[in-house]
């Protein structure tokens, strides 16, 4: 590590604490409370308290520390993490088409579950913090939901302005949060150090063996202690592997463990504190500041999830899983700071509906977990493929490591499945809707490409037929998704105007399996006959296409483009659903609606609107 990197490391680590660990860092607000006082409460006995604490501790060790920090964070896609980055990494190396198809569906479903999860996290986090007002005085109970709705509304309304300015406070606030978590827990452990016996895995094993039914019910809520663990991998591209690991081992994990064990120590002495063990750790004089700090921490956790949803939306668009949407860059300095209006308002409506419909954090906890455990299960399957295809691990070792992690994931997923009638149906339903949208768009675009390929003619035949066509001054650029053949917009233009520009460029944008593409590898320019050339522009799945910027790079290849002498011809497809094609009628209609409402190509590719000619074409699918 360079001296410059060493100097920057503390700042990066603090910034990572502010973004990466918000979700898992606010879990102490409700995790133990839900285990002992939720929809499937465990009796508050010393034996059960120690058994549950042991389960929580070893869940953090196995699912977060070993699985994500030690193993999955090694599977980065040029520094980027997350289910879609992992999907791109695996499909790039899967030679078997059927295997590649299965892996792709798994990755898409993981992304779909993430959308379901991202609706619940802001609702349960902020609501659980504001519920601390009830501890101060029960008279404030009626204000909890209005205050929560007000905070969430403010949070979603400021997204379009970006969070760069206030984002600088996220790290220090979360450092203070984790520091207080540790202090409150340590204070209570000092009164009852016997609680540390639960660090021994035998307590978890005995609890599971002697109270199998209770342990199974407990697992459904124990998972609340590890929700957000997947964010360590998802946010790796923003901060790097080492700062996240340093923050986890050096500060965040010890603070979480101390707080959970502090709550356990409190319950051993005062079982009646189970109504809100987290806030009962604080002295009476500190309750109001604690509610304020907890609310700030949950807002930061929610912001991280919202930003993650924007990032996944952009990845999905680039990977051909969603139609073009408006993507606004909210920072001139940071490429990753974006705002996706459709995603923002969809999440907002869902989050508000959840708060109003479920009414308290305990009810929401029943809905939480199923999406997270589903995502974790899929991540384990995908990383098993990475172990075989990329790391070339011995298959016996893969079976041992991945098999053990799969068993743990399946146990947690099964325990959460019993919560489906109580609220778990919501993230699953939202995940299913998202999965349907993602796969419908992917399938529809493939059918459109196939239909356009049928209607196209070979470039060689076209070039031979244009000798007598009148050529006019200037440059015409035709955007096309096909790497060969003649774009429909070019044929339509020639048919109606009977002329061609003296220079014609066919531009195809490709998305790679990597998060970014170096400018040296951005473009491929192929000169053909009679003033025609084909330009391939490559972008990573974390980048936003910029065609004028790509044309600037052509200077290095001897081609210059003057925007005032250049006309962009774009094809606007009108989709006509058909009963006779390879898609169910309702899905064809859904695809047609998505296609109609997609952001215009000129906006998405940053093409000057005063230089655009749009030509319509009708396609039957």
UniProtKB/Swiss-Prot annotation:
The name this protein carries in UniProt is: Probable potassium transport system protein Kup 2
List, alphabetically, the HAMAP family matched: Kup
User: Origin organism of this chain?
Assistant: Dechloromonas aromatica (strain RCB)
Entry keyword Translocase: no
Q: What does this protein do?
A: Transport of potassium into the cell. Likely operates as a K(+):H(+) symporter.
Q: Does the keyword Cell inner membrane apply?
A: yes
Q: Which family does it belong to?
A: Belongs to the HAK/KUP transporter (TC 2.A.72) family.
Which compartment or compartments is the protein found in? Answer: Cell inner membrane
| CC annotations in GO | plasma membrane
Q: Which Pfam families match?
A: K_trans (PF02705), K_trans_C (PF22776)
